[in-house]
């Protein structure tokens, strides 16, 4: 079933023209509209911009151009990453109107790698819990058992992946916030080495966690997806791309 294919597999399907990015985005959106009301993983929707990005990906491919390893792959991101024009709340009611003016650097790099970002996923208050409830968006449920938690703080990310509502995801981790929900939901998650991935655009306004604790990282449907995500966002990948 295409909903449960890895990001690398989805990118290959698009590259081989077995499915278009627009078709794949529409497919994931249809699954969000069908299943998200029960799971409550995706809490911010940015469909119109995503449709334009998917169309651009298809147009570039028709010219023989590939944008990157995630070319045309629809994905969502944790509600702690800035996505221009959308709210970054971090689950904190005080930030419910905090509209990002520009993308986080990691989001910018994911887009440069070809990803089509169509929404954001739920988190606990200030990303500080092993469940994913906040007063703004409510509780995210585990898609395997709606009476149970998907974990946290990247619970919305893991639940969206496990339910086949997105092709790839992002999270962040200090003491298990990627690894815990990945385990709870049966998907893959990786806490990268500190300093490998850029944290700019992943912090509360005027507040920074200790830089030697917080890292950002990928969640996916395969271990290969984790490598793809890390390389797409890392400084190493940027230097290689520029040379």
Regions found by a protein language model. Give the residues of each.
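An N-terminal boundary/leader segment
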Residues: 1-52
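Short, well-ordered beta-strand elements within core beta-sheets of diverse protein domains
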Residues: 10-16, 95-99, 214-221
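Conserved hydrophobic/aromatic pocket- or pore-lining residues that grip, position, or stack substrates
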Residues: 28, 50, 72, 78, ...
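Long amphipathic alpha-helix in the N-terminal Rossmann-like dinucleotide-binding domain
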Residues: 50-58, 114-115
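Immediate post-signal peptide segment of exported/extracytoplasmic ligand-binding proteins
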Residues: 57-73
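Enzymes and membrane/adaptor proteins characterized by extended Gly/Ser/Thr/Asp/Glu-rich
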Residues: 69-106
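Short glycine/serine-rich loop segments
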Residues: 102-230
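Conserved small/polar residues in nucleotide/adenosyl-binding loops
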Residues: 236-243
């Amino acid at each position: 079933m295409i909903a449960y294919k890895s990001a690398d597999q989805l990118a290959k399907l698009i590259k081989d023209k077995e499915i278009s990015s627009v078709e794949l985005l529409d497919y994931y959106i249809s699954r969000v509209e069908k299943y998200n009301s029960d799971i409550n993983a995706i809490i911010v929707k940015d469909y119109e911009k995503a449709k334009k990005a998917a169309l651009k990906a298809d147009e570039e491919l028709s010219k023989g151009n590939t944008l990157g390893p995630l070319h045309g792959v629809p994905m969502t991101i944790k509600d702690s990453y800035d996505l221009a024009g959308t709210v970054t709340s971090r689950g904190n009611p005080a930030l419910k109107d905090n509209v990002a003016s520009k993308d986080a650097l990691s989001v910018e790099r994911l887009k440069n790698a070809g990803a089509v970002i169509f929404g954001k996923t739920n988190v606990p208050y200030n990303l500080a819990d092993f469940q994913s409830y906040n007063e703004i968006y409510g509780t995210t449920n585990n898609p395997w058992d709606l009476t149970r938690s998907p974990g946290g703080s990247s619970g919305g990310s893991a639940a969206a992946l496990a339910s086949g509502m997105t092709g790839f995801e992002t999270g962040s981790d200090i003491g298990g916030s990627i690894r815990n929900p990945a385990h709870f939901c049966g998907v893959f998650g990786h806490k990268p080495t500190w300093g490998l991935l850029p944290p700019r655009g992943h912090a509360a306004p005027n507040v920074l966690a200790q830089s030697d604790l917080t890292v950002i990282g990928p969640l996916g449907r395969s271990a290969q997806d984790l490598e793809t995500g890390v390389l797409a966002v890392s400084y190493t990948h940027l230097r290689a791309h520029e040379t």
